Regions:
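Intrinsically disordered, low-complexity eukaryotic regions enriched in glycine, serine
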Residues: 2-87, 91, 110
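Ankyrin-repeat boundary/"N-cap" motif
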Residues: 66-75, 97-117, 140-152, 172-186, ...
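Ankyrin-repeat-protein effector appendages
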Residues: 62-75, 199, 222-269, 349-353, ...
Length: 408
């Protein structure tokens, strides 16, 4: 490890370890870059911006002690041990700002999420949250992280109420880019969504230049979650006057599960059955980047596991094997079954079974977007091959496709 005294100080690792630093010092001696262990330790101290090894050691010892205390605090929270939480945080008030919870916002965020144990907030958990706020925890930590995490699940509304009573802001933007109202939109929790709206949350919260610039309605349409609650969430936002940049009534009514309105659209314009919608820039889920751009209404029904809509569309002449449009790079061309077969928790299996029963081609191949964490990845595969990749586990859907004779 060559050390140049002209270099700017190097930051310590996120979780510095004294043993690792000692090993680094020994490696310097072994490599001939320091004459003695003391000299090597001094070089390391200077490398990390300290004037001496004892000062570096004291700093790392302090950090390690803080991490141990934070781990103890998390264990106390997870077991709802209020007395232990009080003792730890009273002894060390800095624990109110310990890197716990989503985005390391703080212990209050972790308490509010009620993730461990996964349950509705108990009286003990609510008392814990109130004690933390009364004794130094910031209800706005991370941009109202506690309220954002509580709003992910309907059963946490009592926690949301407590946070609001203590000054939480329903119109805050977590981390500067995620409006609190987007939390129940992401997880499709209509109760928490309505609670936020009833308490002043603005659904028309679009902001140009933000990471997520759209309204709450646009966000709920684009979420990766799949649930029978989708229609209720859309209806709640429409009733609240939420707008959308998307002008596609037939698609929205399909997503709402309004078969009466879908039928009315199709009666008024039978060509909608075969239309390919270039504006559908949503539909990704199960870790894949594939969206519905250039796809048909049957693709939409397949993506959202809407068996009733799929049956209506096929009965009215929808092509089971309609291929979505290709982009300029030749990516796309997937048939509806690709969407139904690649869902978390076999959400699309009933639609897969229906499409196969009606003659879906299981040998068709397409070049499609890969994993969302690998933006340059594209894969050439069949419906079964895509289902094996996304969400990436053996499933009842994969088993069914194999039994149906699908090509790998």
């Amino acid at each position: 490890m060559p050390i140049d005294s002209q270099d700017a100080p190097r930051p310590l690792p996120d979780r510095p370890n004294l043993r690792h630093l000692k090993d680094q010092a020994r490696a310097l001696v072994k490599a001939g870059e320091a004459a003695t262990l003391s000299a090597a330790q001094f070089q390391l101290a200077r490398l990390y911006g300290f004037t001496s090894w004892p000062k570096l050691k004291a700093h790392v010892d302090s950090l390690e002690a803080s991490m141990r205390e934070a781990a103890e605090l998390k264990q106390a929270i997870d077991t709802n041990a209020l007395g232990r939480v009080k003792a730890l945080m009273t002894r060390n008030p800095e624990l109110h700002r310990a890197p716990l919870g989503y985005g390391e916002n703080g212990p209050l965020t972790w308490v509010a999420e009620c993730r461990v144990p996964w349950e509705a907030p108990t009286a003990a958990r609510l008392e814990m949250a109130q004690w933390m706020i009364d004794n130094g925890s910031d209800v706005h930590q991370g941009g109202d992280g506690p309220l954002m995490r509580a709003a992910l699940v309907d059963s946490r509304i009592p926690m949301m109420e407590l946070l609001l009573q203590n000054g939480a802001n329903v119109n805050a933007e977590w981390n500067g880019y995620f409006p609190i109202i987007f939390a129940p939109c992401e997880t499709l929790e209509p109760g928490a969504l309505k609670w936020l709206l009833d308490h002043g949350a603005n659904p028309n919260c679009g902001k140009a230049g933000r990471k997520y610039p759209d309204s709450a309605l646009d966000y709920v349409i684009g979420t990766y979650s799949r649930s029978t609650n989708l229609g209720a969430c859309i209806d709640t936002l429409l009733e609240a006057g939420c707008g959308s940049r998307r002008n596609m009534p037939v698609v929205v009514d399909l997503l709402r599960g309004r078969m009466d309105l879908l039928a009315r659209h199709l009666d008024g314009d039978p060509m909608l059955i075969q239309k390919k919608f270039l504006e559908l820039d949503f539909g990704s889920t199960a870790a894949r980047r594939l969206t519905l751009r250039g796809a048909t209404l049957l693709h939409v029904a397949a993506e959202y596991g809407n068996l009733e809509a799929a049956k209506m569309l096929v009965e009215r002449g929808a092509d089971i094997n309609a291929a979505a449009d290709l982009d300029e790079a030749g990516v796309g061309g997937q048939t509806p079954i690709f969407h139904a077969a690649t869902q978390f928790y076999d959400w699309g299996l009933p639609v897969v079974e229906f499409l196969v029963e009606r003659g879906a081609d299981l040998s068709v191949a397409a070049k499609l977007p890969g994993h969302y964490e690998r933006p340059d990845e594209f894969v050439d595969c069949s419906p079964l091959g895509y289902a094996r990749l996304f969400p990436g586990k053996e499933s009842k859907t994969v088993e069914f496709l194999r039994e149906a004779g699908a090509a790998e």
